[in-house]
Regions:
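Catalytic Walker B motif of ABC-type/P-loop ATPase nucleotide-binding domains
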Residues: 41-44
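Helix N-cap at the start of a conserved alpha-helix in ABC-type nucleotide-binding domains
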Residues: 52-54
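A short, surface-exposed alpha-helical micro-motif characterized by mixed small hydrophobic
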Residues: 82-84
């Protein structure tokens, strides 16, 4: 019950996950993972299929995990989120690592043209 409360779903304790919304299912998955007391949690595009409001809820849960010291490896296009919570960022393009470093280095002084183009597109779209 404590873990469901931690992800904001204490009121859903008697429901099957399949009866929950997509965002709620994501949070149930996080609670299930936390029940194993992991050293590291892996996330693969945790907000990609969610509307922005629900995606923000997932990011808030992940931010709390980071604040509590959870090590996470996150594959994401949510660059604003990565910039705020990451200790290190790895930029991949077409299956190849193009750059890695601190968020400040990656976002303030990109070295490769691919990363420069990616960040420029995000800025133009208002997503960073």
């Amino acid at each position: 019950m404590e873990l469901l409360d931690r992800v904001g779903l204490k009121d859903k304790a008697d429901q099957y996950p399949g009866r929950c919304s997509g965002g709620q299912q994501q949070r149930v998955a996080i609670a299930r993972s936390l029940s194993l007391d992991p050293m590291v949690m892996l996330f693969d595009e945790p907000t990609s299929a969610l509307d922005p409001e629900v995606g923000a809820e997932i990011l808030a849960v992940m931010r709390e995990l980071a604040d509590d010291g959870m090590t996470m490896m996150v594959v994401t296009h949510e660059m604003g989120f990565a910039k705020k919570i990451a200790d290190s960022v790895v930029f991949l393009h077409k299956g190849r690592v193009h750059e890695s470093g601190t968020p400040d280095a990656i976002f303030s002084a990109p070295q490769t043209q691919e990363l420069k183009d990616f960040l420029s597109a995000l800025h133009q779209a208002g997503r960073l």
